[in-house]
């Protein structure tokens, strides 16, 4: 294969940390050699991750979204391989709306 593997498992759960949150949903996202998986927007999520160099903290928030200030924390985890490198990521958002606005499509599942 000409492409290093990029295969990720993303989860979301209610809570402030992955250690205490029960995963509510889990999706798979494979970006090489082609976009596939159970993520609802594989092509755009892979394009967004490539644009950020695989850096989840560099994903651009969707500026047009207004969210309430309700505190109902959700935690997203990402584990797997991105372009041949092991990856483990965790991020807590104030609520589901803020999570969905945290990227164009990667966190929208």
UniProtKB/Swiss-Prot annotation:
Record localization: Secreted
Record carries keyword Disulfide bond: yes
One GO CC annotation: extracellular region
Domain of life the protein comes from: Bacteria
The keyword Cell cycle is assigned to this record: no
Pfam families membership: SSI
Positions of the record's site feature: Reactive bond: 69-70
A GO term for molecular function: serine-type endopeptidase inhibitor activity
Disulfide bridge map: 31-46, 67-97
Keywords associated with the record: Disulfide bond, Protease inhibitor, Secreted, Serine protease inhibitor
Family according to the record: Belongs to the protease inhibitor I16 (SSI) family.
Subunit structure and binding partners: Homodimer.
HAMAP family (alphabetical): SSI (MF_00778)
Function as written in the Swiss-Prot or TrEMBL entry: Strong inhibitory activity toward subtilisin BPN' and, to a lesser extent, toward trypsin.
Name of protein: Subtilisin inhibitor-like protein 7
Annotated source species: Streptomyces ambofaciens
């Amino acid at each position: 294969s000409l492409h290093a593997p990029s295969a990720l498992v993303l989860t979301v759960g209610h809570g402030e940390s992955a250690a205490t949150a029960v995963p509510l949903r889990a999706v798979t996202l494979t970006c090489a050699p082609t976009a596939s998986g159970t993520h609802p927007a594989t092509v755009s999520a892979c394009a967004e991750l490539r644009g950020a160099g695989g850096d989840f903290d560099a994903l651009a928030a969707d500026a047009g979204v207004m969210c309430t200030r309700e505190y109902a924390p959700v935690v997203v985890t990402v584990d797997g391989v991105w372009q041949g490198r092991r990856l483990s990521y965790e991020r807590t958002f104030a609520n589901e709306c803020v999570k969905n606005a945290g990227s164009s499509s990667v966190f929208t599942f």
